A protein has these predicted regions:
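C-terminal motif of bacterial Sec signal peptides marking the signal peptidase cleavage site
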Residues: 14-16
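Bacterial signal peptide processing site
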Residues: 18-20
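Bilobed "Venus flytrap"/periplasmic-binding protein-like clamshell domains
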Residues: 23-55, 121-194, 276-280
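An extracytoplasmic/periplasmic, membrane-proximal ligand-sensing/linker region
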Residues: 35, 163, 167-168, 173-175, ...
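Beta->alpha turn/N-cap motifs
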Residues: 59-63, 73-86, 101-102, 132, ...
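Alpha-to-beta junction loops
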Residues: 71-80, 151-155, 171, 195-206
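Ligand-binding "clamshell"
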Residues: 89-118, 198-201, 212-226
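A bilobed periplasmic-binding-protein/Venus flytrap-type ligand-binding module shared by bacterial periplasmic
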Residues: 127-137, 232-245
Length: 294
């Protein structure tokens, strides 16, 4: 019996040593749209190249799902936008100053949840009200204010978050005095552009870096009353992970300022227009980034 107990203890000790010596596991999440999945995949591959193990938890859902998973310790990092954090998570009124928004979200996230913001990736992805190009020309639509003259004819279709968030449709309607007779249809994000193209809806709330805008010949309406706050893209990271995992810090710092809005639109187009796999697009981007850095 003593020999058996000694053997069991030895096995536990050995297995514990194996776990301790194993590469760190990093859990990366994303929201449920193409750009988010791609950004998460880019960081996942960058970390795997450094020898880390990655648990991909992609397409989780919207902002609140990802945020709750992060602060609960179920995720280590995911891509986020400063304006989204400012208005949706911190429940603050939209502010136009990018530096002020960044400072506020950095401070509040650190104080409330011990979460760190990585360096900005180099682009903003703001909400964008999008119409078919033919309708923009036919109705003379250039700005969001122009919609008021055609409210009775327009069938809006929006995602759940845009319908509910303060920096989404509720505040937008108040700011611009919009009163659509037809209640906006609530749609899955992946269905917005197909619905617009097939004339099921006439107006959608997309994102300024969506690759399908140019591909479909759609038109983005100017936010002439400057309603939407800045939405600088970055990663939010659990403080303990940022502090103790040098590979995570190095990967995110290396990405800082490296993705312009034009680059992000082109990458998104490869996913949504060309139907490429996020894994392949991420691999190509990292290869290009490596060649530029060498």
């Amino acid at each position: 019996m003593k020999r058996l107990a000694f053997f069991a203890a030895a096995v536990l000790t050995i297995s514990g040593c194996q776990r301790a010596g194993a590469p760190a596991l990093v859990r990366i999440g994303s929201k449920n749209f193409s750009e988010q999945v791609l950004l998460a995949e880019i960081v996942a591959q960058a970390l795997e190249a450094k020898g880390l193990r990655v648990d991909r938890r992609l397409n989780l859902g919207g902002t609140f799902v990802c945020h709750k998973a992060l602060v609960a310790g179920d995720l280590d990092l995911y891509p986020e936008y400063t304006g989204t954090a400012f208005t949706a998570i911190l429940a603050k009124k939209p502010v136009a100053d990018p530096a002020a928004v960044r400072k506020e979200v950095e401070g509040e996230y650190a104080k409330r949840w011990g979460v760190v913001w990585s360096p900005a990736l180099g682009f903003e992805n703001t909400f964008a009200l999008v119409v078919r190009g033919e309708d923009a020309r036919r109705w003379g639509l250039k700005t969001i204010s122009d919609l008021r003259a055609h409210e009775a004819e327009i069938r809006p279709g929006f995602g759940y978050e845009f319908l509910e968030r303060e920096d989404g449709f509720p505040g937008l309607a108040r700011t611009y005095g919009l009163e659509f007779p037809r209640r906006p249809a609530q749609m899955d994000l992946g269905l917005l552009y197909p619905a617009l193209e097939s004339h099921q809806v006439d107006l959608i709330a997309g994102n300024s870096t969506d690759g399908l805008i140019a591909a479909l010949g759609a038109a983005v309406l100017e936010d002439d009353r400057h309603y939407f706050p800045p939405y600088e893209a970055a990663f939010v990271v659990r403080g303990q992970v940022w502090k103790t995992n040098a590979a995570v810090r190095e990967a995110l710092e290396r990405l800082g300022g490296k993705i312009s809005a034009d680059t992000m639109r082109k990458l998104n187009a490869r996913l949504d227009r060309d139907k490429r796999r996020p894994e392949d697009v991420a691999k190509e981007f990292l290869k290009t980034l490596s060649s530029l850095s060498s």
